Amino acid sequence: MLEILFPVLLLLGIAVFCAILLTVAAVFFAVKEDETAVAIRECLPGANCGACGYSGCDGYAKALAEKTTTATNLCVPGGDDAAGEIAAILGVEAADVVEQVAYVACNGTCDVTDRKFEYQGHKSCLTANMVYSGDKVCNFACLGYGDCAVACPQNAIFIENGVAKVDPRKCIGCGICVRQCPNGIIHLIKDTSRVIVECSNHDKGALTRKICSNGCIGCMKCQKTCPNGAIKVIDNLATIDYNLCTGCGECASVCPVHCIHEGNFVCGAHF
């Protein structure tokens, strides 16, 4: 009997000793959380998208609590509500959040452009891009394998006819999709913007015509038509200065290849 009881008691004693030791260590080596940081963290949506410029929600909350930044409006997904709650905690005036929405600067669907070869590898834009810059003829095109859609925390992106599309009603402007795109053709703009250029091709017009009938050919009709000088052709591609754009839509109406589109991000109208 003692042969069994002694080992059991020994192990029990070791377990109790370790438990006491861990409890003491937890008390003496505990890292006290900043109550202000905790309160701020609860105001944030928890997307951990990094759109604020910090590592995530915890990083932003800590920076605000430690007063290394006083900008209460950096959380785009949280919007004005989060900014107001943070400002109340810090005892400062709330700043307005510039809400943003993502869009894909490509309309090279399967109907208007071709593929260079049949890609049979892993269905990922990043992987496909490593093979001759992707399987689409246009090297600036959306590859359509959905890395952005997989990464989107709001399920706001879907693939339609070989091109990623953003549902502005779901998009929170976190910017995760922007960082996932290997071709860098997803952009964030203010959700009050009304006109976008759905092309990223910087080739000369003659070459663009051959590979995509929806591609910008740099004809400059939009630039000549814009009453505010908000759109210019830079490196063979129409580019909009949203600080000058009033959303009149004149550029879209004269675009011969229809790569400039009007949309309503606030109401969620799709392009």
Q: Predicted segments — roles?
A:
Residues 2-225, 229, 254, 258-261, ...:
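Ferredoxin-type iron-sulfur electron-transfer modules and their immediate structural context
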Residues 203-204, 233, 237:
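Cys/His-clustered metal-coordination modules, chiefly Zn-binding fingers
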Residues 240:
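Active-site substrate-recognition segment that forms the wall
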